[in-house]
Amino acid sequence: MAKSAYESRLKKEYVERIRKAMQEQFSYANEMQIPRLDKIVINMGVGEATGDSKKPTVAAADLAAIAGQKPVITRARNSIAGFKLREGMPIGAKVTLRGVRMYDFLDRLINIALPRVRDFRGLNPKSFDGRGNFAMGIKEHIVFPEINYDKVDQMWGMDIIVCTTATNDDEARALLKEFNFPFRQ
């Protein structure tokens, strides 16, 4: 893939400021040990997909607008009779962001989307998995500016997983705080 001339604001901030701050805080022996963002995975599960097979397609279109990249339709792995679910039925959409799109999405998430969430008091600082990855959920996808509120017939939630190269939660928490993640006190 060709390298573009455009560099994201957050990527530039990471290279110029955040790496130095992380090096001072944790005093790594090697520059490659400094944690960085690896990828962001956005998953949108559509629970009502069993009744209407068009809903995952609509959710995927909204997710494509939010992420700026075409999502993959996720399908059920096995049948569950209680949920009227058959193996192979479309049940949601997911997208994996890396590189410039990842940093651009993170910028919009932190500065635009999270402040628009109703009754937002900050992200849970305990939502790390023990290996340096952070997971969060958003109940309404309309907080993103790419979604036209008037054209939305149904609101969906989404899971956002921020994967870092950090080896533990403390390093990942420090990295995300440097990116101005609004953690709860």
From Swiss-Prot:
One of its GO terms (biological process) is translation. GO terms for molecular function: rRNA binding; structural constituent of ribosome; tRNA binding. Keywords: Ribonucleoprotein, Ribosomal protein, RNA-binding, rRNA-binding, tRNA-binding. Pfam families: Ribosomal_L5 (PF00281), Ribosomal_L5_C (PF00673). It comes from the Bacteria. GO terms for cellular component: ribonucleoprotein complex; ribosome. Gene3D superfamilies: 3.30.1440.10. Belongs to the universal ribosomal protein uL5 family. This is one of the proteins that bind and probably mediate the attachment of the 5S RNA into the large ribosomal subunit, where it forms part of the central protuberance. In the 70S ribosome it contacts protein S13 of the 30S subunit (bridge B1b), connecting the 2 subunits; this bridge is implicated in subunit movement. Contacts the P site tRNA; the 5S rRNA and some of its associated proteins might help stabilize positioning of ribosome-bound tRNAs. Part of the 50S ribosomal subunit; part of the 5S rRNA/L5/L18/L25 subcomplex. Contacts the 5S rRNA and the P site tRNA. Forms a bridge to the 30S subunit in the 70S ribosome. This is Large ribosomal subunit protein uL5.
